């Protein structure tokens, strides 16, 4: 049968009803597309609103072609009058289309009988017929509708409509338009004006040369559709196959699926694919779209899956994608490049002295003490910042007064002003540890300690009496060490020093021991773990640690190298799990963070991890392990994992530790045996907290408690030892147990004590960098890094945008921006609009801190962050809180300007601050103003604040 798609210039439903009721009018119908097939009948069709089984047109009436002579109208490109359609109407074929509307017999009063003629049925059911036509069919009356839906050119409209409407297939209009562009690679015909009349539109389509190519296009589109389906099916298969065999954490797996499809179907890749499957005029119809089969799947494998196959294999990841730079030092103690010559000294002091000796003070007392030291030593030593940063600098410095004094005073260090006791003088020649002690009622004291009584105050004298020095299992050995337990805190800092102590990280000191804060997030429903599960977990983690250490640093002997494990005690049944980790701070809390870091501290992180994740599936304890529970932790399992770097090897920058933690986070998910153990019970991704490796961050020491934030005076969640003995000490484990009890082996900056003798020790070395080649930033994992590479719009480099703002178009290719240039940009273009919004929208007591007579100083910290300070003579000062008026306001709030880019040359600047009070969310980043600064050559409307 022959199908004719037609349109009208008047309401199509009424015109069709007139044809059905055989009511002549002056209207015409305009044939647009014709699908010929030898037949006496011609079916006139309209596009349906809904398509069942991809049928997008349906007939509204049929005519007898012998009477109508359709070819005569098509050849003349003329519309068909209604009179011709009425005269040729085939009622026998048309009536079944509307029979369901004529359910009730109609009686004619004039004839006294039932109406049976079709035209009379339509007349008496006129409203039902119109309603049916309007509900089922699309009835556009303007060419602009067809142009907006199917395309703006002659070939685009004709070929798209012919395939989309007449061929039973599942392609969308956008897909068919893409097929047309691949079929007509050179010319798509003339552009159709949107103001054309329906007659002009019909004449254009009926006379188009593209009508001769419809059959060829249909054959190509069918072949292309089949090829597209095969390609996408192969991509689906590859993505699912890798997902099933790869050991990906749940969240990473979801992101992987998105990344894989974005990689396979990226814009550049689809443009290449279009060239491969473009129409070949010289090829036979059956040979169309057969070049390079599996194109998208091969590219997906090359660009992503092959890389992920290596990146998510532990051996390949460590060998191919992790790069370590080590600097070998001179072994001569008098050389300038020896560890001694470079000042790579760790903590001194005594851990088993006769008494506790050191400085103890709150943040306010610390500020006063440092001010006093500055006053006493102003002519000899540089002034110290009146905060924890100043104390860390004081305790790390090896400088003495030899430049300005003679005799014995040349060995006099600035620490002597902090600890003037003469008996401590020999202990002050090396750096001192700085601790934070948590007191009841959420109070905190900072300590710089030269001597303490670690073993005598912390452990009972007979602690090791029942520990065997013979072959024992790790589980049995751990059970032989019993520690006395306390639960009520003391208000005395000296007493609480041995219960709630935290080591403060000092970036000015070398790191000898890698201290890992490992929080394993448990799946919902996991409320108990068997002893075997916990110890197998620790043994698996030790295996991963040793594999990473041997690959990154060498000179690692897995059968001898110590790894010390400590587990947070399980919460009692009466204590909520999420009471274990509330953030700490008060209004008197001073700055103790690195200025470039905005992450939460260890306690804040633990509190955050206690928030339940609704995205994990339920798992009951009985399905995890049927043995009695050894661990009753819910939500997360907290471990402290400490291991020294190989002998004679130190790290000198926090970024190295963050990179090592990033490598370990990834490696934990790649060990096959460990993954089998972890997958049913936990979400192992990002278990290591990298935020503790920043200047001024603190981490709880082993054997220490947490303070209960609700009760105020009670302690809980003590870090208890789990002894995982290396094979070399399995026969005589007592020495290893003693080493795990030794404080010197548990601190960031203390050289390890009683290290086992190694067959071959390396020369002195410094770890300069550890870098994941694919994910160089510790802030983003593999999936996030690769996702940035396939985004539609890429941000311009910050250096490029800064240079454009400084020098215009000529400087957009500058290789680097100096601190002086960055300061000039901030002063001239960034700070004025920020200050304007600050003075307009903030209280005067806040904004006046940034205006005259105060002199501001802008200190760049990299290219994207600038610290704002106030100059006070030779010193700098911070600001009071910009959000609240605290009960004890202090000038300890740090203010920064962040710079970031977008895909244009516009520059975004954000003014934010960091206040260390609990009311301001304990060191959280508080953004105050964000403005968009347009490039110099763009019109400059007022900066927009967000």
UniProtKB/Swiss-Prot annotation:
- Composition bias, Polar residues: 617-626
Source domain of life: Viruses
Q: Which GO biological process categories is it annotated with?
A: bidirectional double-stranded viral DNA replication; DNA replication
Q: Name one GO molecular function term.
A: DNA-directed RNA polymerase activity
Specify where the region named Disordered lies, as residue ranges.
596-626
Q: What does this protein do?
A: Essential component of the helicase/primase complex. Unwinds the DNA at the replication forks and generates single-stranded DNA for both leading and lagging strand synthesis. The primase initiates primer synthesis and thereby produces large amount of short RNA primers on the lagging strand that the polymerase elongates using dNTPs.
**Name of protein:** DNA primase
**Encoded by which gene?**
UL70
């Amino acid at each position: 049968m022959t199908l004719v798609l037609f349109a009208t210039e008047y309401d199509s439903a009424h015109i069709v009803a007139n044809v059905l009721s055989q009511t002549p009018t002056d209207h015409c119908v305009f044939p647009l597309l014709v699908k010929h097939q030898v037949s006496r009948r011609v079916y006139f069709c309209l596009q349906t609103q809904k398509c069942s089984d991809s049928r997008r047109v349906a007939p509204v009436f049929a005519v007898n072609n012998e009477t109508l002579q359709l070819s005569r109208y098509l050849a003349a490109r003329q519309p068909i009058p209604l009179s011709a359609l009425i005269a040729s109407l085939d009622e026998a074929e048309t009536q079944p289309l509307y029979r369901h509307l004529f359910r009730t017999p109609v009686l004619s009063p004039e004839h006294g009988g039932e109406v049976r003629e079709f035209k009379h049925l339509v007349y008496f059911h006129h409203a039902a017929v119109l309603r049916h036509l309007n509900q089922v069919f699309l009835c556009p009356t303007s060419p602009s509708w067809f142009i907006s839906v199917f395309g703006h050119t002659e070939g685009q409209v004709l070929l798209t409509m012919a395939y989309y409407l007449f061929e039973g297939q599942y392609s969308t209009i956008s897909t068919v338009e893409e097929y047309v562009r691949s079929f007509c690679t050179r010319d798509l015909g003339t552009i159709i004006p949107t103001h054309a009349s329906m007659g002009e539109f019909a004449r254009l389509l009926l006379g188009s040369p593209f009508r001769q190519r419809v059959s060829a296009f249909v054959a190509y589109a069918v072949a292309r559709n089949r090829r597209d389906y095969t390609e996408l099916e192969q991509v689906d298969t590859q993505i699912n196959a890798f997902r099933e065999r790869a050991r990906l954490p749940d969240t990473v797996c979801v992101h992987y699926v998105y990344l894989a499809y974005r990689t396979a179907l990226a814009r550049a890749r689809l443009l290449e694919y279009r060239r491969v499957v473009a129409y070949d005029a010289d090829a036979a119809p059956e040979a169309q779209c057969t070049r390079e089969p599996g194109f998208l799947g091969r590219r997906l494998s090359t660009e992503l899956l092959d890389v992920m196959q290596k990146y998510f294999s532990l051996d390949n990841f460590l060998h191919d994608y992790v790069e370590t730079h080590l600097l070998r030092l001179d072994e001569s103690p008098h050389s300038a490049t020896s560890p001694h010559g470079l000042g790579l000294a760790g903590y001194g002091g005594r851990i088993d002295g006769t008494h506790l000796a050191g400085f103890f003070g709150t943040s306010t007392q610390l500020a006063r003490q440092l001010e006093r030291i500055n006053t006493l030593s102003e002519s000899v030593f540089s002034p110290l910042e009146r905060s924890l940063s100043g104390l860390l600098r004081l305790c790390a410095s090896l400088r003495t007064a030899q430049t300005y004094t003679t005799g014995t005073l040349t060995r006099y260090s600035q620490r002597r002003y902090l600890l003037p006791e003469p008996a401590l003088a020999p202990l002050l020649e090396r750096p001192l540890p700085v601790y934070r002690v948590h007191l009841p009622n959420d109070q905190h004291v900072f300590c710089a300690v030269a001597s303490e009584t670690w073993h005598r105050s912390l452990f009972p004298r007979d602690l090791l009496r029942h520990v065997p020095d013979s072959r024992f299992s790790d589980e049995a050995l751990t059970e032989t060490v019993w520690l006395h337990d306390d639960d009520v805190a003391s208000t005395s800092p000296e007493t609480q020093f041995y219960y709630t102590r935290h080591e403060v990280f000092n970036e000015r000191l070398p790191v000898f021991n890698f201290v890992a804060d490992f929080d394993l997030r448990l799946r919902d429903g996991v409320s108990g773990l068997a002893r075997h599960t916990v110890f197998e977990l620790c043994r698996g983690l030790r295996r991963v640690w040793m594999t990473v250490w041997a690959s990154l640093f060498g000179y690692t002997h897995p059968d001898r190298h110590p790894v010390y494990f400590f587990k947070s005690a399980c919460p009692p049944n009466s204590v909520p799990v999420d009471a274990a980790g509330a953030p700490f701070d008060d209004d008197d809390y001073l700055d103790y963070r690195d200025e470039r870091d905005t992450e939460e501290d260890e306690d804040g992180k633990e509190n955050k991890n206690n928030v339940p994740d609704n995205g994990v599936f339920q798992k009951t304890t009985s399905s995890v392990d049927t043995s009695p529970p050894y661990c009753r932790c819910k939500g997360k399992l907290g471990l402290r994992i400490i291991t020294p770097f190989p002998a004679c090897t130190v790290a000198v920058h926090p970024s190295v530790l963050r990179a090592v933690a990033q490598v370990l986070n990834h490696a934990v998910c790649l060990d096959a045996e460990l993954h089998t153990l972890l997958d049913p019970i936990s979400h192992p991704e990002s278990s290591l907290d990298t935020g503790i490796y920043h200047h001024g961050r603190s981490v709880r020491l082993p054997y220490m408690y947490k303070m209960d934030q609700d009760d105020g005076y009670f302690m809980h969640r003590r870090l208890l030892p789990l002894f995982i003995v290396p094979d070399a000490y399995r026969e005589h484990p007592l020495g290893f147990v003693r080493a795990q009890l030794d404080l010197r082996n548990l601190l960031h900056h203390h050289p390890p004590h009683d290290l086992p003798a190694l067959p071959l020790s390396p020369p002195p070395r410094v770890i300069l960098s550890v870098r994941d080649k694919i994910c160089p930033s510790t802030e983003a994992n593999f999936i996030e890094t690769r996702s940035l590479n396939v985004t539609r719009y890429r941000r311009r480099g910050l250096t490029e945008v800064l240079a454009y703002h400084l020098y215009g178009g000529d400087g957009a290719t500058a290789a680097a921006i100096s601190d002086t240039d960055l300061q000039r940009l901030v002063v001239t273009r960034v700070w004025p609009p920020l200050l304007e919004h600050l003075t307009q929208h903030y209280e005067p007591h806040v904004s006046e801190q940034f205006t005259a007579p105060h002199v501001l100083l802008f200190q760049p910290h990299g290219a994207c962050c600038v610290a704002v300070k106030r100059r006070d003579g030779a010193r700098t000062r911070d600001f009071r809180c910009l959000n609240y008026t605290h009960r004890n306001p202090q000038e300890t709030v740090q203010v920064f300007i962040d710079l970031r880019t977008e895909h244009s040359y516009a520059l975004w600047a954000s003014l934010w601050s960091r206040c260390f009070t609990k009311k301001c969310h304990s060191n959280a980043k508080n953004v105050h103003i964000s403005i968009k600064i347009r490039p110099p050559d763009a019109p400059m409307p007022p900066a927009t604040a967000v």
